[in-house]
Amino acid sequence: MAYKIRLGGTNEFVSAIDPHAPHCYPPGEVKFVEGWSNPAAIIFLTKTSAERAKDKVWEIEGFHTTIEEML
C-alpha cells in the first residue's frame, strides 16, 4: 500500500517538505499540488513514513492533513 498526505477537505497533496527553508520564518516550508493523480505529489511507501511527514506538516504549517491510501 502507498500513501499521500492531503490538505484537509481539499484536493491538494503534499509535494515538498523542507523543515529548514531559510526564506521562511520560522524556518520550514510545505508545498502542495492539486489533483489526486498529480505526479508531483509525494508518495509514501509506508504508513509510518506518511505519519512522520504528516506530523512534520503540522509542526511547520499547523495545517490539518489526512493520510490517504493509494490503491
Could you describe each region identified by the protein language model?
Residues 38-71:
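Short, mixed-charge low-complexity intrinsically disordered segments
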